[in-house]
Amino acid sequence: MKTIVIKRDGCKVSFDQTRISDAIKRAAEACQITDDDYCEFVAQSVSQSLAGRSNVDIREIQDAVENQLMAGEHKDIARAYIEYRHDRDVAREQRGRLTQEIRGLIEQSDVSILHENANKDSKVIPTQRDLLAGIVAKHYAKLHILPRDVVLAHERGEIHYHDLDYSPFFPMFNCMLIDLNGMLTNGFKMGNAEIEQPKSISTATAVTAQIIAQVASHIYGGTTINRIDEVLAPFVKASYDKHYKVAQEWQIADKEAYANARTEKECYDAFQSLEYEVNTLHTANGQTPFVTFGFGLGTSKEARLIQRSILENRMAGLGKNRKTAVFPKLVFAIKDGLNHKFGDPNYDIKQLALECASKRMYPDILNYDQVVKVTGSFKTPMGCRSFLGVYEENGEMLHEGRNNLGVISLNLPRIAIEAKGDEAAFWSLLDKRLELAKKALMTRIARLENVKVRVAPILYMEGACGVRLKADDSVAEIFKHGRASISLGYIGVHETINALFGTQKHVFDDETLRAKAIAIIQRLREATDQWKAETGYGFSLYSTPSENLCDRFCRLDAAEFGIIPGVTDKGYYTNSFHLDVEKKVNPYDKLDFEAPYPPLANGGFICYGEYPNLQHNLKALEDVWDYSYTRVPYYGTNTPIDECYDCGYTGEFSCTSKGFTCPRCGNHNPARVSVIRRVCGYLGSPDSRPFNAGKQEEVKRRVKHLANGQLG
């Protein structure tokens, strides 16, 4: 029987006795002993001890050599062999990727690690600790958890296994809608404290901040509170009742006016504290909690007050320089008959939201009717863009407490490059990659199958996931039957079309190319629908934000296939289905171009436009919002809101490959400027936490979406 040796990297080679004898002879030479017969005898003895074995690990062979040498007459050779093996192991480890990445973090020299996430400040110790844990977790998962073909596909850039620094090493999931109402209403335990139902809005928001921090430390994606205005409205009423009681006790003449004034002040202060709390917290993941607040549908006096408080606080800014807050991400719901048009009861709140968006870029908007049409029911996205599908429990629609288990993204441009212009080859390759992506996604599900509730009490025992399970229960059941989603992502539709059909025609300008692009996403959707039917899990199609991936996929493809005009030449791939950032079109045409995609990729999407300063032209901004209402479910507006604290300039800083600079005075000191950019679905501060090279280049190339050079 031929013996196969399994090497450290998993490769398999035929057993060769001469390699053993050569190593022993080198050890003998090192201690100046000449006895070739002895060396051959030891090698032969080791070979005989392994006879009949089909497979043997390289370490087992080396251990056998050491044992034979230690039992033999030349102890010096044994010592020399052991020292030689140790030195080789050390040298090998120093050359290994794990050690190289750890060194790159410690020495702050590996920008791919330092700038991978724009929400993580890699200069500070807590973040460095998280990044170190992530390096180790990623290394272990690749070697010991994931199938080899999945790992190789990830390494080559055929697919991307998102968040490998957390999952599958840890039994964590991606993003979620917190069941805040259930937690505040029924109480819960956090650490050593039993938390009862709050008796005021200030207490409710303080507790909410602690819930956000705890939840964000147990998951790796975004944390969303759906309809926060409606959830917290009862606690505003509780505050009003307390203030009214004080007015009665002190015999204040206009008790109602007093109670209203005190309640408005308390509500504003409560949400100011919540905003500061979110932006000063550091989770166990080494970052500010990536949290989203959905609001806008509440009609009560209390809910309206919360809506105003959220928007007014955001406009006020943070600190003495009134800096734009990056978190929470604000998502404002617009509904016809409620706040959409003049005369609607909450139209005044929409006007406040428009003002806020012009000054602070947030809120993004959710168009109620389109969200229901595309996703089956109304809900705020989890994180920046992940949407849940329809799920009923006890005959009622359920949103809160649900989550996404994770994402695997396809590199569509690479498939197109490999197809070499052959559409049939493209579709064949795509189907093969889809099978691989499904296999990778199933590993995420498998990792959670035998996990006990006790690993994350805040999620599974105290109500964040909408359940109150026991410590030794399994978590797997709450992810089945579509209660949780699990997503196939994709990137670079624009570059895919260019790779397949050339750059003579732009996809925006050619109806045939548009149809071909849509057909690709239609095929992805068919695959996820099929997987859902086969497994019972909530597979969905997700338009990947690609903050880091836009750089990584393009970099790998350029190294493999060279610089291809219109594909790998820019240094980044375009975000999901979005229009090429360099294409000069008006915002209405851009909306129409992107509108077909959210209904297909209804597990995750966002559309947005680039605009000039609109603070003095809110009507123009409202026109775009209104145009989007019947066309896309989810829309964001990017406007220039940069500030220089040296010369007082406000507007748009100059963007170069090296960073951002004040166009008036040249200031680029992160401590003396505020630069805010949409990273993908959320905002970032690239002045203090730089983007990766690909994302920086993409931001640099963005053009304004204007009608005939102007808007409005």
Stretches found by the model and what they are:
Residues M1-Q108, Q696-V703:
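Charged, amphipathic alpha-helical regulatory modules used
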Residues T3, V46-L50, V291-T292, E495-L500, ...:
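Short, hydrophobic beta-strand segments
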Residues D16, T656, G681-Y682:
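Conformational switch/transducer regions in large eukaryotic molecular machines and scaffolds
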Residues A28, F271, E275, A499, ...:
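Metallocofactor- and cofactor-centric catalytic cores in central/energy metabolism, strongly enriched
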Residues A91, L98-G482, T503, D510-N669, ...:
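Conserved catalytic cores of very large enzyme subunits
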Residues E230, I486-A499, Q522, R678:
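Contiguous, well-ordered alpha-helical segments that form the cores/surfaces of helical PPI scaffolds
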Residues G666-G712:
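Long insertion/accessory domains within large nucleic-acid-processing enzymes
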